[in-house]
């Protein structure tokens, strides 16, 4: 059977659009905090990825605007992000969208501007079970967690990021049809108590931290061994308390 190039392009667009993802909300110590979209999540108008590394959308996605609420936590709590596609019970993201996951923190007063983003968590390719972070996110029903660090009490932005590499064989700046896809979501979080707090160090800017020459931005997952992949810097902060990709709760049981 023969297919026209136009038809294949259309099919590719439809498949791509059906694969996009956003953060629905968060859980704290296994307790669902409810639908956070435009409430405590700075939600973009749709689930399209960001691809332009120089765009201000690299900060907290499109329309980085303050939303009315913030989720209260304490240092040492487990904060879990829950991603979704269109509805909470559908596929999280296409299985073809292999890539890493990271979580950053910044003071909310900065609105994410400047050298303020500090990496708390990173997971890319697991050589033990030969899976990408996104593969395990799908298995975990869209949930991954980070432990709230011991920083000064106050308001913060937690920036969850997925980098989908299925079209990262080319750079967006050279071929806008392709390029790595960034799924970004910022949650407004208030840390109420923290013993022995450690000041956040200087961080990196978004946009600015990633460039065309940054490791992990251009990578051909089809021809290059996944074991050679290096996630984009910066490295995880020494004061970070870790995280994981695992399901902590089942929304269908609520």
From Swiss-Prot:
Chain positions found as Methylhistidine: 20
Protein localization: Secreted
Protein name as annotated: AA9 family lytic polysaccharide monooxygenase A
Alphabetical list of CDD domains matching this protein: LPMO_AA9
Residues the entry annotates as binding (1,4-beta-D-glucosyl)n: 28, 66-67, 77, 86, 148, 159
Role according to the record: Lytic polysaccharide monooxygenase (LPMO) that depolymerizes crystalline and amorphous polysaccharides via the oxidation of scissile alpha- or beta-(1-4)-glycosidic bonds, yielding C1 or C4 oxidation product. Catalysis by LPMOs requires the reduction of the active-site copper from Cu(II) to Cu(I) by a reducing agent and H(2)O(2) or O(2) as a cosubstrate. Is able to cleave phosphoric acid swollen cellulose (PASC) in the presence of a reducing agent, yielding a range of cellooligosaccharides dominated by cellobiose and cellotriose.
Catalytic activity, as annotated: [(1->4)-beta-D-glucosyl]n+m + reduced acceptor + O2 = 4-dehydro-beta-D-glucosyl-[(1->4)-beta-D-glucosyl]n-1 + [(1->4)-beta-D-glucosyl]m + acceptor + H2O
Biological source species: Panus similis (Lentinoid fungus)
Signal peptide limits: 1-19
Gene encoding the protein: LPMO9A
Binding site for O2: 166, 181
Molecular function as annotated in GO: metal ion binding; monooxygenase activity
């Amino acid at each position: 059977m023969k297919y026209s190039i136009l038809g294949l392009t259309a099919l590719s667009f439809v498949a791509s659009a059906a694969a996009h993802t956003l953060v629905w909300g968060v859980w704290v110590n296994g307790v669902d905090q409810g639908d956070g979209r435009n409430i405590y999540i700075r939600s973009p108008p749709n689930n399209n990825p960001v691809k332009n590394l120089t765009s201000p959308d690299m900060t907290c996605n499109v329309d980085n605007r303050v939303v009315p609420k913030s989720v209260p936590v304490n240092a040492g709590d487990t904060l879990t992000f829950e991603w979704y596609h269109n509805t909470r019970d559908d596929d999280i993201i296409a299985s073809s969208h292999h890539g890493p996951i990271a979580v950053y923190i910044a003071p909310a007063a900065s609105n994410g501007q400047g050298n303020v983003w500090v990496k708390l968590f990173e997971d890319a390719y697991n050589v033990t079970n030969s899976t990408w972070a996104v593969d395990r996110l799908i298995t975990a029903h869209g949930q991954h967690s980070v432990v709230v660090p011991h920083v000064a009490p106050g308001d913060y932005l937690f920036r969850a990021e997925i980098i989908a590499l299925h079209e990262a064989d080319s750079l967006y700046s050279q071929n806008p049809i392709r390029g790595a896809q960034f799924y970004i979501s910022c949650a407004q979080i208030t840390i109420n108590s923290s013993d022995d707090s450690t000041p956040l160090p200087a961080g990196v800017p978004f946009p600015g931290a990633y460039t065309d020459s940054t490791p992990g931005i251009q990578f051909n997952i089809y021809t290059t061994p996944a074991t050679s992949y290096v996630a984009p810097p910066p490295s995880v902060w020494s004061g970070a308390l870790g995280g994981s990709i695992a399901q902590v709760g089942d929304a269908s049981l609520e």
